[in-house]
Amino acid sequence: MKKVLVFAAFIVLFSFSFLSTGLTAQAALKDGTYSVDYTVIQGDSDSASMANDYFDKPATVTVNGGKSTVSLQVNHSKWITGLWVEGNAVSVTSKNASSDTRKVSFPVSTLSNPVNAKIKVDIDDDDLNYHHEYQIKLRFDEGSAKALAGAVKSSDNNTTTPATKSDSSNKVTNPKSSDSSQMFLYGIIFVATGAGLILLKRRAIFK
């Protein structure tokens, strides 16, 4: 009986690993421009960094040919004197001295996993003198992606098609082929589980 339970537990864990992989693959964004929520977390943990408050949300993500470029706004711009993402300095696209903000952009290799970054803070105030560099990570929430500019490019012919209301307020619809693959995977898992349980029961009977 213990062998049956162990086998069943293994199948369940194995199934979840495959399903999570499939969901990650389906979450990939088509070519287009999106608003995406994100959190600045500490470099060595999943906890929010103090720097999180210095980055305005959401970010704007442009996907072109499968490559993603992120644009976001930094507040307290005078304090944030340096920002590097995946080892490269970000590009400053605009500054606003009156609001003490600046917009930056940078390419990222992935949106599915936290992106390594480094920040440099220099504060020279009467009440505070602080100079430090430290590691952070940018954790993007692909599930929050909303299409912007009223259009999403088709990956088939690279043309731009109007986005429907559902595109602008919900996740990007997954292709039907992915749904079929998912159902096929469910079938394999179900058959394998049933066959394994029957085999183990037969062995138990003949012992």
Curated annotation (Swiss-Prot):
Signal peptide bounds: 1-27
Main location: secreted
Compartment(s) where it occurs, according to its Swiss-Prot or TrEMBL record: Secreted, Cell wall; Secreted
Region annotation Disordered: where it falls in the sequence: 151-178
CDD domains cross-referenced by the UniProt entry: NEAT (cd06920)
Stimuli inducing this protein: Present in both exponential and stationary phase (at protein level).
GO cellular component, one term: extracellular region
Residue list for modification Murein peptidoglycan amidated serine: 177
Gene Ontology biological process: cellular response to iron ion; heme transport
InterPro entries for this protein: Haem_uptake_protein_IsdC (IPR019909), IsdA (IPR050436), NEAT_dom (IPR006635), NEAT_dom_sf (IPR037250), Sortase_SrtB_target (IPR017502)
Motif NPKXZ sorting signal in this chain: 174-178
Pfam families in the cross-refs: NEAT
Residue ranges of the propeptide: 178-207
UniProt KW Transferase keyword: no
Annotated NEAT domain residues: 29-148
Biased composition (Polar residues): 154-178
Stored Gene3D superfamilies: 2.60.40.1850
GO molecular function, one term: hemoglobin binding
Outcome (variant: residue 175 to A): No longer attached to the cell wall
This protein's UniProt keywords: Cell wall, Ion transport, Iron, Iron transport, Peptidoglycan-anchor, Secreted, Signal, Transport
PANTHER family linked: IRON-REGULATED SURFACE DETERMINANT PROTEIN C
Functional note: Binds both host hemin and hemoglobin with affinity in the nanomolar range and presumably directs it to membrane transporters.
NCBIfam families: IsdC (TIGR03656), srtB_target (TIGR03063)
The protein's name in its UniProt record: Hemin/hemoglobin-binding protein 1
Organism: Listeria monocytogenes serovar 1/2a (strain ATCC BAA-679 / EGD-e)
